[in-house]
Amino acid sequence: MTYSIAILGASGYTGAELIRLIAGHSALKITALGAFSKAGQSVAQVFPHLRHLDLPALLQIDQIDFANIDLCFCALPHKTSQEVIAALPSDLKVVDLSADFRLRDPDAYEKWYGNKHAALKQQAEAVYGLTEFYRDDIKTARLVAGTGCNAATGQYMLRPLITAGVIDLDDIILDLKCAVSGAGRSLKENLLHAELSEGYHAYATGSTHRHLGEFDQEFSKLAGRPVQIQFTPHLIPANRGILGTGYLRGEAAQIHDTLSQAYANEPFIDVLPFGETPSTRHVRGSNFCHIGVVADRQPGRALVVAALDNLTKGSSGQALQNANLMLNIKETEGLMMPPLFP
């Protein structure tokens, strides 16, 4: 069986990544592509690297007929996404890649994103889309909220450790190095090549990054009490990838065993041998996440290091993984291609 797919926000980086991934999928066919400023253009005009694909032209979203669409990916910015999704047919399956439906508490959304939520009905039904931990809920969901790429990285590192109680919850420091594509495709002065190249810097310092809302929500739920981590992201002059380092209080060997057992049967999460650390180069363009554990020289302290591609496992790949579950397709379909190298 072939399912008809629409992608809204198809002219951005995550939209392009969805097109690339679905092009190799045996059960999905892209029948509609929505955009705003680039509506009316062909995919070849917007993304020359995809010109060999037989795809529809980009349309204004209100021009799309959703009657025969089986599932819609929404890759629009937050705030815009909730407005668009609220107007879609109420029985249409949707995977949202924005931040609009990740936080269950409307007050938390307003705190982190600066505006009141305008689609509370949809927010209440949304399922958090961290696939490996919400698999059963995702299978029956109508609306799935994709995680933030930073939030996904940190949770793959820490969730099993919090559940198992093998780390000090009041002493978690998370440092992430993030590629520039995570900031989107729109023109920003600080993201120009001459402004970004040959250096990197911390941003959203003082634990102010919006993805902390997801960490607070998910880690506190796991622990059964409030958990607040210290988190600082850094912008690096790379196109793809996130490298996360967690500084933790706990026994390194026990931490490694816990992660290895938690992910033993997960097709996309690979825990490296004890003492090895991952590289973003080894997951580039793939839906894989590599995790390593190293003992610190201080007794009772450990490092957990994770690498994933922010556009794939951190966003569009995870979205496709969720869509597979929602449509009762094999979860790994279209996602097992190896990373790009070099």
From Swiss-Prot:
Keyword Transferase: no
Signal peptide span: none
Keyword terms of this UniProt record: Amino-acid biosynthesis, Arginine biosynthesis, Cytoplasm, NADP, Oxidoreductase
Catalytic residues identified in the record: C149
GO biological process, one term: L-arginine biosynthetic process
E.C. code: 1.2.1.38
Catalytic reaction list: N-acetyl-L-glutamate 5-semialdehyde + phosphate + NADP(+) = N-acetyl-L-glutamyl 5-phosphate + NADPH + H(+)
Cited InterPro entries: AGPR_type-1, NAD(P)-bd_dom_sf, NAGSA_dehydrogenase, Semialdehyde_DH_NAD-bd
Main location: cytoplasm
Gene3D superfamilies referenced in this protein's UniProt entry, alphabetically: Dihydrodipicolinate Reductase, domain 2, NAD(P)-binding Rossmann-like Domain
Cellular component aspect of the GO annotation: cytoplasm
Residue ranges the record marks as coiled coil: none
Pathway: Amino-acid biosynthesis; L-arginine biosynthesis; N(2)-acetyl-L-ornithine from L-glutamate: step 3/4
Molecular function, one GO term: N-acetyl-gamma-glutamyl-phosphate reductase activity
Family matches, as CDD domains: AGPR_1_C, AGPR_1_N
Pfam families reported in the protein's UniProt record: Semialdhyde_dh, Semialdhyde_dhC_1
KW GTP-binding (keyword) present: no
Cellular localization per UniProt: Cytoplasm
Similarity comment text for this entry: Belongs to the NAGSA dehydrogenase family. Type 1 subfamily.
Function: Catalyzes the NADPH-dependent reduction of N-acetyl-5-glutamyl phosphate to yield N-acetyl-L-glutamate 5-semialdehyde.
HAMAP family: ArgC_type1
Protein name: N-acetyl-gamma-glutamyl-phosphate reductase
Source organism of this protein record: Roseobacter denitrificans (strain ATCC 33942 / OCh 114)
Lineage of the species this protein comes from: Bacteria, Pseudomonadati, Pseudomonadota, Alphaproteobacteria, Rhodobacterales
Encoding gene per record: argC
